[in-house]
Amino acid sequence: MTHKSVRDYIRTIVDFPHEGILFRDVTTLFADPRGFRIAIDQLLAPYAGMRFDKVAGLEARGFILGGAVAHQLSTGFVPIRKKGKLPGRTISVSYQLEYGEAVVEVHDDAIQAGEKVLLVDDLLATGGTAEAGIKLIEQLGDQVVGCAFVVDLPDLGGRRRLEAMGMEVHALCAFEGL
């Protein structure tokens, strides 16, 4: 029996959402129980022996991964959502998109000051959303001690952007090109 890598479970869709784009679809990874288990185990591997108070996941696929990682760590999960999706009091950070601006939010009481947080998402492209998530967590007085992704798109510079902020970045696989 051959063992598949996480990369083998990820489907590439040509010209989605726009012509010239190679979309890396992780839903095929999520749908396969073996692939999903491998991904969660590998997301956790670099952090063996470390203690986290919370896992934060970026909307939307980061919720799937972050929830599973938090379960494995027996810790709480904090969703970082698009503006207007969370009830109650929130704090927000805006960040630049290719054509405009976006805002992400978190509940202002989701994480207690001084907690250590692992940030999780499916894909690292430019790093804008992850950077905004890190800034939200830091506004609450907490420390992001790692950023874990399934896919890194190195040509888009997200890893360099987060490492320039002093973040430790872990990705299970990389896909060159757009």
UniProtKB/Swiss-Prot annotation:
Pathway: Purine metabolism; AMP biosynthesis via salvage pathway; AMP from adenine: step 1/1. It catalyses: AMP + diphosphate = 5-phospho-alpha-D-ribose 1-diphosphate + adenine. The keyword Transmembrane helix does not apply. GO terms for biological process: adenine salvage; AMP salvage; purine ribonucleoside salvage. Its EC number is 2.4.2.7. NCBIfam families: apt, PRK02304.1-3, PRK02304.1-5. Belongs to the purine/pyrimidine phosphoribosyltransferase family. Catalyzes a salvage reaction resulting in the formation of AMP, that is energically less costly than de novo synthesis. This is Adenine phosphoribosyltransferase. The gene is apt.
